[in-house]
Amino acid sequence: GRPMVEQLMNLDLKRAYDQSILWAEEHKAFSVDMLKSLSALVMKNTGSLYSTLQGDFDSSKGDLRLVGVTAGSGGRSYMNYLKVPSRLTDFCNAINQRREILMQHPNDIDAYLLSFDAHNILVAIHPWVDGNGRMSRLIMNHLQFEFGLVPSKVITEDKAAYIEALNASREEESMLPFQCFMLNEHTKNLRAEIVE
């Protein structure tokens, strides 16, 4: 059988998706509290309490990180934790503006691009000490559910290319590399499903 942690992680993720879908159907506006609530569901059984010089925070409650984080061991550092709250507020405001436009003028391609950009930006902010990848994919799918789109996924064998695309977007300070990767990935997955 699978390790217990993985089972708990998947159970938590399913509950987070259930909540996300309800909020997507209600067209609930994005807010820092909403993101923290979803993160608390994602990390419910695998998160933990951290005691740092900056104070205590609990990843199982969706608390934003109060420490620096890097991509893997010895990887590049994500933004300073002090910048996270304001960047997350800006993120919510920007996403809400684009959501409002889409509600008035629905456009599937623009909705997909919004979902990919939200994913990309959330990874770059890295608001939590753990679960950022799961949250970024959840938020991408959340926006796709909200606008009635077929949800996109990244298949296991494309994981390296997915990480490369995220890195390219960050290095070039452009949404394009990740948008192109995700559009290609989504098209490929849809074609494969049609063939099956």
What kind of feature is each model-predicted range?
Residues 1-130, 134-196:
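FIC/Doc superfamily catalytic core
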